[in-house]
Amino acid sequence: LSAIKGFYPLDVAQDETTREFFEEFSKENPGVKIDVLVHAIGFAPRSCFDRPILFVEDADINTAMTISANSLQRCLKFAMPYLSQGSSTITLTYAASTRFVPSYGIMSMAKAALECWTRELACHLGPHGHRVNSISSGPIRTIAAQGIPGFDRILDHVEANAPLRRNVDQSDVAGTTLWLASPLSAGVTGQCIHVDAGYSITMVPQSIMDA
C-alpha cells in the first residue's frame, strides 16, 4: 500500500468520470494491480426520507439506485483491466435489503439491488478469477447513523436480542473485510456475509419471552 499514490475524487454516477478515475490511478501507479476493491458508497437525496415512500420522485429514486447500487457494476466495468488475478471486491449492505426497517426507505431497495449485483457480478467475473462478496453489518454508531430517528433504541434492541447479546463495531466489520480480502476466503464468492452478532437469524425477540 505504501506504493500507492494519493487520493482520487470519483463521481460514480457517470461512465466517463469512472473510466478516467481508473485510468488516472493506473497512470500514477504504473504496473500496480488492484488486489482488493472495497465499494462503500451509499447515498439518497434527503427528499427520499422527508416524504412517504409512495410519493418519492422518480429522479430521486434513480439517484439513490445509481449511486448506492449500480455504481458497483460501473466501478468493476472500468476496473477490470487493472484487477489482479484472484482479486476480491467487497461491498457493504444492510438487513433492510430483505426486511422492513422503519425510516430506511428507498435505501432498502438500493441495498437489495446491490446484493443482486453482487451475485450477478460474482458469476460473470468468477471465470476470470475475480471474487465479489457483500458484508451485511448490524447497526453501528457512525456519523451517518446519527441521522436515523431512534437509532439509540435500535442499538438497545439489537443488544438485547442478538444471540451474542451485543452490538458489532467497526473492528468486527474490518475483520470480516480482511478475511474476504485475503486468500483465506479464496473459495467464497457471490455471498452476503452477515456481521451482526447473529441478529439476522432471529425472528421472535428474546425480550418478548423474557417479559
Language model features: what each stretch is:
Residues 2-62, 81, 103-106, 146-150, ...:
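Conserved mid-core segment of classical short-chain dehydrogenase/reductases
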Residues 17-20, 63-66, 70-78, 119, ...:
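Conserved mid-core alpha-helix of short-chain dehydrogenase/reductase
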Residues 42-81, 85-127, 139-141, 199:
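Catalytic loop of short-chain dehydrogenase/reductase
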Residues 126, 131, 188-190:
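Short, small/polar-rich loop/turn modules that mediate ligand/substrate recognition or access, typified
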Residues 127, 137-162, 202-211:
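A glycine/serine/threonine-rich, flexible loop-to-helix segment
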Residues 131-141, 181, 194-196:
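Conserved SDR Rossmann-fold cofactor-binding beta-strand/turn motif
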Residues 162-173, 184:
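A conserved structural motif in NAD(P)-dependent oxidoreductases
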Residues 178, 189-211:
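Short C-terminal tail/terminal secondary-structure segment
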